[in-house]
């Protein structure tokens, strides 16, 4: 869904100078559908799946809009470090959220409740923290672009801009190859991240709390890695940085498979 809609949403945001407004909309959508998972349980699998799909769609679309602000916030020679700061803060936010959820589950267990009974409430905690963390963006971030004239209507203009971009892509073969490669390696990374917790629980028999601790450790190392790698990216270049991270991913996956 994100792959199919992102080009049109991006064209619409550029034409209307609406990145911030769309980011607010996607943030609200992510918060609401994450919180809605609180109301799911046995017998509501379809509803839970729909909420997960919707929350991830809004989150992923919001990530694209956030990335579109980067050229406005950082000079080309500092994009790596600024991006690294952003990802590091995001991972620290994840640590805060997971820490709060882990504390809630521990408190529930101490009170004699089953862990499974307290898990739905962590959806509300996560949604609330995500909403609070987003507030500085909407209070202080400015939309620097100016709306463009739309003589043929905004929808027609967005489609026209998208068609022009696809047509011009033929003249930028490197960009086209990069976008295709990004599609595949991001899909692989997303699959690994999504299945990691499931693998830990089903194959390694991790409890819910063990899984949360694992995610806490992963987020902590990722925060340090993103912060440091941002500076490295500015020194060695973006292409080499991506190649280095993908080699690291491949190596770690092979080692995990052999373990």
What are these regions (language model features)?
Residues 81-105:
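Glycine-rich segments within core transmembrane alpha-helices of 12-TM secondary carriers
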Residues 194-214:
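Short amphipathic helix-loop junctions that connect adjacent transmembrane helices
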Residues 142-180, 203:
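Juxtamembrane intracellular "pre-TM" segments in multi-pass secondary transporters
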Residues 97-106, 128-147:
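C-terminal membrane-cytosol helix-exit motif in multi-pass small-molecule transporters
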Residues 5-18, 224-238:
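Helix-to-loop junctions at the C-terminal end of transmembrane segments
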Residues 53, 167, 171-192, 196:
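Pair of pore-lining "gating" transmembrane helices in MFS-fold secondary transporters
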């Amino acid at each position: 869904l994100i792959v199919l809609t992102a080009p049109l949403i991006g064209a619409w945001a550029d034409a209307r100078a609406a990145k911030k407004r769309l980011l607010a909309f996607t943030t609200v959508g992510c918060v609401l559908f994450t919180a809605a998972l609180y109301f799911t349980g046995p017998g509501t699998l379809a509803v839970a799946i729909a909420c997960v799909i919707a929350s991830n769609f809004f989150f992923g679309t919001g990530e694209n809009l956030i990335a579109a602000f980067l050229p406005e916030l950082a000079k080309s020679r500092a994009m790596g470090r600024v991006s690294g700061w952003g990802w590091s803060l995001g991972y620290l936010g994840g640590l805060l959220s997971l820490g709060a959820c882990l504390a809630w589950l521990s408190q529930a267990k101490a009170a004699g409740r089953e862990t499974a009974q307290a898990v739905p409430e962590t959806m509300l905690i996560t949604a609330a923290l995500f909403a609070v963390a987003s507030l500085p963006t909407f209070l202080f971030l400015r939309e620097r672009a100016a709306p463009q004239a739309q003589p043929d209507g905004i929808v027609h203009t967005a489609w026209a801009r998208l068609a022009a971009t696809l047509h011009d892509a033929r003249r930028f073969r490197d960009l086209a190859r990069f976008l295709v490669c990004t599609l595949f390696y991001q899909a692989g990374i997303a699959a690994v991240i999504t299945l990691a917790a499931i693998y830990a629980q089903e194959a390694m028999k991790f409890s819910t709390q063990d899984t949360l601790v694992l995610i806490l450790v992963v987020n902590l190392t990722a925060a340090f890695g993103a912060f440091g790698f941002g500076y490295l990216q500015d020194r060695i270049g973006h292409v080499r940085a991506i190649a280095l991270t993908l080699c690291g991913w491949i190596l770690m996956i092979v080692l995990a498979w052999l373990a």
